[in-house]
From Swiss-Prot:
UniProt gene name: ftsW
Molecular-function annotations in GO: lipid-linked peptidoglycan transporter activity; peptidoglycan glycosyltransferase activity
Designated name of the protein: Probable peptidoglycan glycosyltransferase FtsW
Subcellular location: Cell inner membrane
Entry keyword annotation includes Mitochondrion: no
Catalytic activity: [GlcNAc-(1->4)-Mur2Ac(oyl-L-Ala-gamma-D-Glu-L-Lys-D-Ala-D-Ala)](n)-di-trans,octa-cis-undecaprenyl diphosphate + beta-D-GlcNAc-(1->4)-Mur2Ac(oyl-L-Ala-gamma-D-Glu-L-Lys-D-Ala-D-Ala)-di-trans,octa-cis-undecaprenyl diphosphate = [GlcNAc-(1->4)-Mur2Ac(oyl-L-Ala-gamma-D-Glu-L-Lys-D-Ala-D-Ala)](n+1)-di-trans,octa-cis-undecaprenyl diphosphate + di-trans,octa-cis-undecaprenyl diphosphate + H(+)
Spans through the membrane: 54-74, 89-109, 120-140, 150-170, 185-205, 209-229, 232-252, 311-331, 360-380, 387-407
Amino acid sequence: MNLKEKLFPENRLGLNRFWNFSRGGIDNFRTGLRDAVSGVEQTRSRMMEYDQLLVWAILSLMLIGLVMVYSASITLADGPKYANYSSNFFLIRHMISLAIAIGVGIWAFKIPTKVWDRYSPVIFGITVLLLIAVLIPGVGRGVNGAKRWIPLGLMNFQSSELMKFAAVIFAASYTVQRQEYLHSFVKGMLPMGIAVALVGGLLMAEPDMGAFVVVALIAFGILFLGGINAKLFGGLIAVGLMSGATMIAFSPLRRGRMLAFMDPWQVDNAANKGYQLTHSLMAFGRGEWFGTGLGGSVEKLHYLPEAHTDFIMAVIGEELGFVGVVVMIFLFYWIVRRAFLIGRTALQLDRSFAGLAAKGVAIWIGWQAFINMGVNLGLLPTKGLTLPLVSYGGSGILMNAVAMAMLLRIDFENRILMRGGKL
């Protein structure tokens, strides 16, 4: 002890108090820092439980769809068909549909994949009954000569959209259960062929050939990925092509659409069956590289029918240009790519149903987007298919959200298993 400490003992006491306080402060700081870092790691761990980029791609398409639906529909109230509606009518309805879809999607994400597997036959059967109900007078609602909707208050539910989802889970479950019979026509191919033919007959009675094409692609695409006999699959493709050609040949409406598709600029076609296609092509032409800007479309001013639904891609091409179209294609490519990768991972983890269901979602979204874009660009004959996650339509948005939720759930379960966890 030095002289100063002997003469002023209170200073020593003060120094000890200061040291104890400082040391306690440092310890508290370290504890707080450790807790903060632990919290960040836990948050990061929770964030890694799902594919963030996939979620952002889905939300981006929904947001672009909301903006473009508003842009494409804002002038519809000026026409006689929607004269009693406000200019914001379709925007508000689409916002409600998105809110319902996201809410249902969050709920669907909580459903384990094995539940979809267990109840897939029940869901498929209920959906078939709904397709029958649409055709019953007084139950189904007709629009533009087609009976495809069941009025449910906030939205007109389209049973064919539910059938696309039902086809994914039913075909995946069927393929897993019939794995040993996939090389047999009678026990492997025929039962699924009968189911698809039944659904096809109901959809063609509405009529909704576009939905039937998508359902058939989903069902037989999953069978192909599940390991069906190559010769049987080749025969199936041949039968499908011949059936399609027969339907076109014996249907004046479809035959006229095919002729208009082959030469849309012919005078009679341009004013009738090829009217939508020619104006869609003009919309893309006006858009050039960077588009005319949001709200700058001319074709949506009562020239291009169904600009906010089937032909929304043409409005995107006109207002956002080639760059906007490329962005849309990339977003769909990313979703389809991730869905196939998630499915492959599930199969590597011996989760056959989950893997095939994920790939079924990829087939659904990929083919429907391809067909819609192909129709808008004049690469395919006109079909009444919307652009997934983008076009106006409550049923389509709802079932797309459920499919995306199931896909994210499969990815979530994959990550749990890869970390050594249990489902």
